[in-house]
Swiss-Prot record:
PANTHER family listed in its UniProt record: CELL DIVISION PROTEIN SEPF
Annotated GO CC locations: cytoplasm
Statement: the UniProt record of this protein carries the keyword Metal-binding: no
Protein family per UniProt: Belongs to the SepF family.
Keywords: Cell cycle, Cell division, Cytoplasm, Septation
Location within or outside the cell: Cytoplasm
Protein name (record): Cell division protein SepF
Keyword Cell division: yes
Quaternary state and interactors: Homodimer. Interacts with FtsZ.
Function recorded in the entry: Cell division protein that is part of the divisome complex and is recruited early to the Z-ring. Probably stimulates Z-ring formation, perhaps through the cross-linking of FtsZ protofilaments. Its function overlaps with FtsA.
Organism per entry: Pelotomaculum thermopropionicum (strain DSM 13744 / JCM 10971 / SI)
Disulphide bond pairs: none
InterPro entries, sorted: Cell_div_SepF, Cell_div_SepF/SepF-rel, SepF-like_sf
Length: 149
C-alpha cells in the first residue's frame, strides 16, 4: 500500500512519465541498433556530392526572321543558355533592332556578347566567359560594319 502511495506521489509530481520516456528511448535505441548496417550506409551515401560533375551546356543557335522571336532568345539567356544569333539573311533594320534588344537583355543579365562573324553574334549569360582571338568589333571602323553594304 505504501508502494502505491509513493507511485501516486511520483505520478503527481510527473516523475513517472520521465521513466516511461526513458524506457521508450531505450527501446528505440535498441531497434536502431538492430537494423542492418547497410541501411545506414545507404542513408549516408545520399549526402555525398561529386565535385567533378559538370552540367552539360546547351548552346542555342537561332536565325530570327521577325522581331517577335527576340523574346524567346532573351528567355534562353535568362535560363543561362548561350545563344548564337545568325542575322546574315535578315534585313539591316530588323537586324539592328534584334541586336539592340538582345544586347540590352544581355546587359541587364550581366552577360556579354561577341561578334563572331559578319552578322553572327554570340550572347552569353553571366555564368560564362567568352575567350576569343577575334578582333574586337569596337576597334573596327564602326560597331556594326556588317550593316553598311
Amino acid at each position: 500500500m505504501a508502494f502505491k502511495l509513493v507511485d501516486k506521489v511520483l505520478s503527481f509530481m510527473g516523475f513517472e512519465e520521465e521513466v516511461v520516456e526513458e524506457e521508450e528511448k531505450r527501446a528505440r535505441d535498441e531497434i536502431v541498433e538492430e537494423q542492418p548496417w547497410q541501411r545506414k550506409k545507404e542513408k549516408d551515401r545520399g549526402a555525398v556530392l561529386s565535385l567533378h560533375a559538370q552540367r552539360q551546356v546547351r548552346v542555342v543557335v537561332v536565325e530570327p526572321r521577325a522581331f517577335d522571336e527576340v523574346q524567346g532568345i532573351a528567355d534562353n539567356l535568362k535560363n543561362r543558355r548561350p545563344v548564337i544569333v545568325n542575322l546574315e539573311q535578315a534585313e539591316p533594320d530588323l537586324a539592328k533592332r534584334i541586336v539592340d534588344f538582345i544586347s540590352g537583355a544581355t546587359y541587364a543579365l550581366n552577360g556579354s556578347l561577341q561578334k563572331v562573324g559578319s552578322g553572327i553574334f554570340l550572347f552569353v549569360p553571366n555564368n560564362m566567359d567568352i575567350a576569343s582571338d577575334l578582333k574586337d568589333p569596337q576597334k573596327e571602323k564602326g560597331i556594326f560594319t556588317w550593316m553598311r553594304s
